[in-house]
């Protein structure tokens, strides 16, 4: 497994269950998206990426390296097959089927972070102050109102705030907005601090790390993985 947030979190829970764990990473575990993302824990983000309108946006974004939907252009049958399936999934029916599952995963993820912090074994920044989704125009307000209705239907607490209420909540961050929706469920952390302290905690618990090591394959016995092959043996 790699040394990003997924790899280290997996190592954390495996060692808690009594397993001997070795984390293999091709770098030095000092960079990448796990260290520099926004750190949001967002139960409010219940709408799947495959949603109505994403096909048109996707075509505009997929060739832009700075977009959230960038893909390196290439002729790849698996990528083309995935793209066709993605297009077929961009329907209102798919959105409605997916939201409950996405919410449950997001809430469970937030719960695990809270449990990590409350255990006292891992010191990291975590605030549960919610998330403001601000808007400037009536059109943007109506678009977000649709998501708000879905979120409330799934049990999330969402409040609509005018500019004065937003300013009272964020007095040191003046905003050129008409208002905002506040999702009470959301939280945020500081990824760089979390990753650093999680790495230290894993070392203290006996997890081994093989850095600057690339996984090149696997050895199998009876169709099961018996060993990992790396560029160092």
Question: Where would I find each of the regions flagged by the language model?
Answer:
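Glycine-rich Rossmann-fold phosphate-binding loop(s) that bind the pyrophosphate
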Residues: 2-4, 26
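Gly/Ala-rich phosphate-binding loop of Rossmann-like dinucleotide-binding domains
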Residues: 11, 15-16, 201-203
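N-terminal Rossmann-fold NAD(P) dinucleotide-binding loop
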Residues: 7-8
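Glycine-rich FAD pyrophosphate-binding loop
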Residues: 15-36
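Helical element adjacent to the flavin cofactor pocket in flavoenzyme catalytic cores
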Residues: 142-154, 173-232
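Dinucleotide-binding Rossmann-like beta1-alpha1 core, especially the glycine-rich loop
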Residues: 38-162
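Residue-level detector of anion-binding/catalytic polar loops
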Residues: 20, 157, 208
